[in-house]
């Protein structure tokens, strides 16, 4: 609605009204809560990614725990250091729970979040199913590949490896009819 007001005021040449409408829109957006979850398999670096987004480092008291073995046992929220309305959610990784993926999705209340899919080493069927769930909910998702330094340390050309990772992710998504182009 605000966009139409801005467009109309702009077409009418009413600059003060354009500015007023833009300011009002910014106020609304800055107060709108945004819940983002890092979703993926255990050990993919979701907690570390949250710390990086918050610029807190992984050893700070306010940081999610990071350990070699299943550090995240239950849902935890962390506020963004840059945007007060953004909450980053650290959930137990898929594969860490003893329940089915369907039960996991219900227990973790996936309908509450926007998604960042976190993967490393391989793009698993759990990632594909999480992406399918997000798409079925009408939500967009992003895929972040972590621990890339380890993947690129094999000596092959980085550009080739990055392209292979991208193609593998797209191929797996398209097999399950997720994000068809």
UniProtKB/Swiss-Prot annotation:
Cellular localization per UniProt: Golgi apparatus membrane; Cell membrane; Cytoplasmic vesicle, Phagosome membrane; Cytoplasmic vesicle, Autophagosome membrane
Swiss-Prot/TrEMBL catalytic activity: GTP + H2O = GDP + phosphate + H(+)
Location of the IRG-type G domain: 32-181
Any one GO CC term of the record: phagocytic vesicle membrane
Keywords for this protein: Autophagy, Cell membrane, Cell projection, Cytoplasmic vesicle, Endosome, Golgi apparatus, GTP-binding, Hydrolase, Immunity, Inflammatory response, Innate immunity, Lysosome, Membrane, Mitochondrion, Nucleotide-binding, Ubl conjugation
Main location: Golgi
Keyword Zinc carried by entry: no
Lineage: superkingdom: Eukaryota
Induction: Not up-regulated by IFNG/IFN-gamma.
One annotated GO molecular function: protein-macromolecule adaptor activity
Post-translational modification: Ubiquitinated via 'Lys-63'-linked polyubiquitination in a NOD2-dependent process. 'Lys-63'-linked polyubiquitination is required for interactions with the core autophagy factors.
Entry's EC annotation: 3.6.5.-
Domain statement: The G5 motif of the IRG-type G domain is missing because the IRGM protein is truncated in anthropoids.
Role of this protein: Immunity-related GTPase that plays important roles in innate immunity and inflammatory response. Acts as a dynamin-like protein that binds to intracellular membranes and promotes remodeling and trafficking of those membranes. Required for clearance of acute protozoan and bacterial infections by interacting with autophagy and lysosome regulatory proteins, thereby promoting the fusion of phagosomes with lysosomes for efficient degradation of cargo including microbes. Regulates selective autophagy, including xenophagy and mitophagy, both directly and indirectly. (Microbial infection) Following infection by hepatitis C virus (HCV), promotes HCV-triggered membrane remodeling, leading to autophagy and Golgi fragmentation, a step required for HCV replication.
Miscellaneous: There is a huge difference in terms of sequence and regulation of expression compared to the mouse ortholog and hence, the function might be slightly different.
Entry protein name: Immunity-related GTPase family M protein
Source organism (scientific name): Homo sapiens
Classification of source organism: Eukaryota, Metazoa, Chordata, Craniata, Vertebrata
């Amino acid at each position: 609605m605000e966009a139409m007001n801005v467009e109309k005021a702009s077409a009418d040449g009413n600059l003060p009204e354009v500015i007023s409408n833009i300011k009002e829109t910014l106020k609304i957006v800055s107060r709108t809560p945004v819940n983002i979850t890092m979703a993926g398999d255990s050990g993919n670096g979701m907690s570390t990614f949250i710390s990086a987004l918050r610029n807190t480092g992984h050893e700070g008291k306010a940081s999610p725990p990071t350990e070699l073995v299943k550090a995240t046992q239950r849902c935890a929220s962390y506020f963004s250091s840059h945007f007060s309305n953004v909450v980053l959610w650290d959930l137990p990784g898929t594969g860490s729970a003893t329940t089915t993926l369907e039960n996991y999705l219900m227990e973790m209340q996936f309908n509450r979040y926007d998604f960042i899919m976190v993967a490393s080493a391989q793009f698993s069927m759990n990632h594909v199913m999480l992406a399918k769930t997000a798409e079925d909910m009408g939500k967009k998702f992003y895929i972040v590949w972590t621990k890339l330094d380890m993947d690129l340390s094999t000596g092959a050309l980085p550009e080739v490896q990055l392209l292979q990772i991208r193609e593998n992710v797209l191929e797996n998504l398209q097999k399950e009819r997720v994000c068809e182009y």
